[in-house]
Amino acid sequence: QQIIYTATQGAHVGVATISPVAPVRYAFIHGPENPDDLWHYDFHHRRGVIVNEQEDLGAVNIDACSLTSPYQAGALRGGTHVHVFSPDGTRLSFTYNDHIMHELGREFDQRNVAIAVPLKAVKVAKKHPREYDGEYFCTLISQTVAYPQKGSDEINKAYEECWIGKQGYTKADGSQQRWAIAFIGDTVSESGEKVADIFLVDLPDDDHAFSLEGDKPLAGTETTMPAPAQGIEQIRLTNTHHRKYPGVLNQPRHWLRSSPQGDAIAFL
């Protein structure tokens, strides 16, 4: 048994994942230090950290947190969860809940999928006592709405993602897509029932592309979630609305998994 990190100041840690390549790094959830009645562990009050087995740097923040408007691109605004390294260990994916939207109303705090890329470290002005810096540039890669239109591809939750292939996947035209993530998304059927299906997001090769703003602000606003970068869009892979037993199972809870070649996704 080996202790790699011990939380202090009333914080707690958990849900560790390990980098698939050297150097050995452990990524895990870190709850807030000095929790109080206003700010304690919750879906929207947690961050990701990394401990490097070969370096004595303690826990290094993955995601920065920006809680004062105007919000900062590359930082997020709340809670990250289940941080999974890419097959080459250069970046991570995770699920995300937003503090600002939670304060606006629980229905607006939809779970999403985000990514941390090694574009640059993000420094935050720290105008709020719960703001902090992060070593990775983080953005959302999924888009949700509070109330999906019945029978549409709109979702109100994105979760339980996976990296596609060890080197991405081969598209129908024979070209290679280097980076992609699949996730489960909750749609609403024409009859008004929740149906969980699988969605795919192709990601850019150039990390700088994650900093390019699209139609909506990367950093979010006081009334909107942070948005994916320019050109990042989710597509629906499965549509099970009309099956006798529609949807991906939520119980037992599980995460999607890709074949090494990226030509298949396993799910229940």
Protein language model features and the residues they cover:
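Sequence signature of WD/YWTD-type beta-propeller architectures
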Residues: 1-268
